[in-house]
């Protein structure tokens, strides 16, 4: 007969890699727990056995019964036989019965057993031997009164079966003390020697020593992996296992160090291509040692990278769920620090390894954290996404992030942080056109004419050239070089998802705090919107403004978006958006020094798009009205806002030269200026003057003074009234940011005052009053004469 084959397979390297250290530790703990349970059970049984032996010595022995003879039929027959045997006792005298009872108490165990035991089955010889052995054991005669017993299961020993009984539990202080002593003995056996209590200084020294050892171990492993990643890939698993550090003194610090170390290691040793899993055919084919070694390295790297990301995800989940582990090594407060380090590592990997495996998994982890309640984590994730958008030239990674963000915003019913949508502003789509004309695309010719072939190359040369082109094409694909067509396709798809998200919010969540971010995004990407949607979009923006539910900043964003749409592909529509000019003219006076400066920046951008870039569509009356209102506004805002507004006024005066009539001081005109009218076309701005510039010449800020004097002189480009190049070459927005007081600093810096000179006492002609000077000279030149002083007359007068 053949030997039975062992069907259990040896676990592969991949399976061993998948076995985490947590599982191994759990198995070890279960094994130790089982051993302790078995030891406790054995000790308990030994204690019960000792108690049973004590009871058996001091108590009446119990007759044995044959367990096989418990059938109801035989039991009835046996009872009948006993009744028949008991019949003659009725015929005996009472004295004889009493005598037999007295003798029965003093009879030997053998006689009592034979008289009371039931007949044994003849075929069961084995049972008879057991009884014989049991009978040979010496017993003591029970003379004490019987106690209530509880029969337990018998114990089989080398000497035979030992009956086990127990008294009915009675409260006995002595026994309780004995049990407590035995329990203490067991605890002392299990518990090791107690750790000596350390002082705070000793504890800190011990912790520092442990931490230094762990740091050296981490550094050694990291150096070995960096020096030779292919041969030391197994050490990556050893380093990752330190993420489960169990020493409560250094657990949190060690885990943070390991997280950062692994993050830097993966950034350094990860190849610049995506590792795909091997097919069955590739696994079955024989390869060289170098290729096999490379495959094992790639497989180990991907698996360890996957486990590392799972560990980071688990740390974030533990912090979000506020759950304590069974080991209780890390406190709830420490979970937040671990989660912050884990999120930071995920953000670094998101930006550094957009081409590598599991990048989409990292995106799925990062996007919900952009909306986290913790401001630090939310800003960290948003900044990482912005960096990814800025450096992503091809657009593959950006498309993945945009898809997840769009789905997340829709799933949360548009109740998310505005910072999530503001990340869209960093997309690199402005450089690429959405659509190209068919005339601009020159399709390559498939065939050459006979003359072209004859002029250019020979047949063999064309063959070599074709092979070179094929090789170059394969190299470009291997190097993942940017393809214009692929880039255009990805950017188009990304932009479609962005606009779908924006239009959903405009349609369903018009009162959402996301509206400013949506309008700002539409303003940036408006030149890429299809012309077919322009009319509908302008109607929606005008409806939002007229509703009155928006703040002045949101209204300004609507105006800015509308003019960005019209400045791009909207030029062909030939639309005069007078209602948007009117709204901006009306909104200007809502800005003041007590409001935020963000509104001023939006106003400067709107004026540039509405007046400067659309100079041909702007009438002179409209330009005059805006210049007059801007100069009035410059009196009510902060210095940096005044500088930006005056710089815009200077540009408008250069763009519309006929507006210099506002600098004339004529007392006559064709009407009366209506400063409170909100219609720029009908406020008669040509009948007023820019008297505000004279007030601004006395402003405390020196740059405001220069701009006011420059505008009063007619904004000349040369001469004494011209501005310095450092002011004239900058745009209004740049000047607004350059002279901002957000950092509580004054630009230009205030000159330090001269130190105070200590005054000296001067005599003689230094006094300005001539009479006082002469009086001092006269008294100083007189000679003092000694005369007795008598104050009695003054005292007498004061007494009376």
Curated annotation (Swiss-Prot):
Residues 27-93, 160-187 are annotated as: Disordered. One of its GO terms (molecular function) is RNA binding. Expressed in colon, heart, kidney, liver, lung, placenta, skeletal muscle, small intestine, spleen and thymus. The modification Phosphoserine is found at residue 787. Transmembrane segments: none annotated. Its main location: nucleus. GO terms for cellular component: mitochondrion; nuclear speck; nucleolus; nucleoplasm. GO terms for biological process: DNA replication initiation; fat cell differentiation. Residues 79-93, 175-187 have a biased composition (Acidic residues). Keywords: Coiled coil, Isopeptide bond, Nucleus, Phosphoprotein, Ubl conjugation. This is Nucleolar complex protein 3 homolog. It comes from Homo sapiens. The lineage of its organism: Eukaryota, Metazoa, Chordata, Craniata, Vertebrata.
């Amino acid at each position: 007969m053949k030997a039975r084959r062992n069907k259990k397979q040896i676990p592969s390297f991949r399976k061993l890699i998948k076995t985490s250290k947590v599982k191994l530790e759990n198995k070890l703990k279960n094994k130790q727990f089982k051993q302790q349970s078995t030891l406790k059970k054995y000790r308990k049984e030994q204690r019960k056995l000792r108690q049973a032996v004590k009871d058996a010595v001091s108590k009446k022995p119990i007759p044995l019964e044959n367990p096989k003879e418990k059938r109801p039929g035989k039991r009835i027959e046996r009872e009948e036989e006993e009744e028949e045997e008991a019949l003659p006792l009725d015929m005996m005298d009472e004295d004889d019965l009493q005598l037999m009872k007295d003798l029965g108490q003093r009879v030997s165990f053998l006689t009592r057993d034979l008289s009371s035991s039931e007949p044994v089955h003849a075929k069961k010889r084995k049972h008879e031997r057991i009884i014989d052995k049991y009978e040979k054991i010496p017993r003591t005669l029970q003379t004490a009164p019987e106690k209530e017993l509880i029969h337990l299961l018998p114990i089989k020993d080398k000497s035979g079966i030992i009956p086990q009984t127990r008294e009915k539990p009675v409260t006995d202080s002595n026994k309780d003390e004995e049990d407590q002593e035995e329990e203490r003995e067991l605890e002392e056996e299990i518990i090791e020697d107690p750790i000596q209590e350390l002082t705070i200084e000793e504890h800190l020294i011990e912790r520092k020593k442990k931490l230094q050892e762990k740091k050296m171990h981490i550094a050694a492993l990291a150096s070995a992996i960096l020096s030779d990643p292919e041969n030391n890939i197994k050490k990556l698993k050893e380093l990752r296992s330190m993420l489960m550090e169990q020493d409560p003194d250094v657990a949190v610090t060690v885990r943070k160090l390991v997280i950062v170390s692994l993050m830097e290691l993966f950034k350094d040793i990860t190849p610049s291509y995506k590792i795909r899993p091997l097919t069955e055919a590739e696994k079955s084919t024989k390869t060289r040692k170098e290729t096999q070694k490379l495959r094992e390295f790639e497989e180990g790297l991907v698996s360890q990278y996957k486990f590392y990301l799972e560990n980071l995800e688990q740390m974030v989940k533990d912090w979000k769920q506020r759950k304590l582990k069974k080991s209780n090594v890390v406190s709830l407060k420490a979970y937040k620090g671990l989660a912050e380090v884990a999120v930071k590592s995920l953000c670094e990997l998101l930006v550094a390894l957009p081409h590598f495996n599991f990048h989409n998994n990292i995106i799925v982890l990062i996007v919900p954290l952009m909306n986290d309640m913790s401001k630090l984590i939310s800003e960290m994730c948003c900044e990482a996404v912005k960096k990814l958008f800025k450096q992503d030239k091809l657009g593959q990674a950006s498309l993945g992030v945009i898809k997840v963000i769009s789905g997340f915003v829709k799933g949360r019913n548009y109740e998310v942080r505005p910072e999530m949508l503001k990340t869209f502003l960093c997309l690199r789509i402005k450089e690429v056109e959405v659509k190209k004309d068919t005339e601009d695309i020159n399709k390559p010719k498939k065939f050459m004419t006979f003359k072209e072939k004859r002029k250019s190359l020979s047949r063999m040369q064309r063959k070599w050239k074709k092979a070179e082109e094929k090789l170059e094409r394969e190299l470009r694909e291997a190097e993942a070089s940017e393809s214009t067509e692929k880039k255009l396709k990805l950017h188009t798809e990304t932009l479609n998802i962005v606009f779908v998200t924006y239009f959903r919010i405009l349609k369903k969540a018009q009162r959402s705090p996301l509206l400013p971010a949506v309008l700002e995004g539409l303003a940036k990407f408006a030149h890429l919107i299809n012309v077919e949607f322009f009319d509908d979009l302008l109607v929606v923006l005008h409806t939002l403004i007229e509703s009155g539910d928006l703040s002045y900043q949101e209204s300004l964003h609507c105006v800015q978006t509308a003019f960005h749409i019209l400045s791009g592909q909207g030029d062909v529509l030939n639309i005069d958006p007078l209602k948007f000019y009117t709204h901006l003219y009306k909104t200007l006076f809502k800005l003041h020094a007590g409001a935020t400066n963000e509104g001023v920046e939006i106003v400067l951008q709107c004026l540039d798009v509405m007046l400067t870039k659309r100079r041909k569509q702007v009438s002179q009356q409209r330009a005059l009205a805006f210049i007059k209102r801007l100069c009035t506004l410059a009196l009510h805002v902060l210095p940096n806002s005044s500088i930006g507004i005056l710089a815009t006024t200077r540009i408008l005066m250069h763009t519309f030269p006929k507006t210099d009539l506002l600098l004339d001081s004529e007392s006559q005109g064709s009407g009366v200026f209506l400063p409170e009218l909100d219609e720029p076309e009908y406020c008669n701005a040509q009948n007023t003057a820019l008297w505000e510039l004279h007030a601004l010449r006395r402003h405390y800020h020196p740059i405001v003074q220069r701009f006011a004097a420059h505008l009063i002189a007619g904004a000349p480009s040369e001469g004494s009234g011209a501005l310095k190049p450092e002011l004239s070459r900058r745009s209004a927005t740049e000047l607004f940011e350059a002279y901002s007081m957000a950092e509580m600093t004054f630009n230009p810096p205030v000159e330090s005052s001269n130190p105070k000179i200590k005054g000296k006492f001067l005599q003689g002609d230094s006094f300005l009053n001539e009479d006082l000077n002469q009086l001092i000279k006269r008294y100083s030149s007189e000679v003092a004469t000694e005369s007795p002083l008598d104050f009695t007359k003054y005292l007498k007068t004061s007494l009376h």
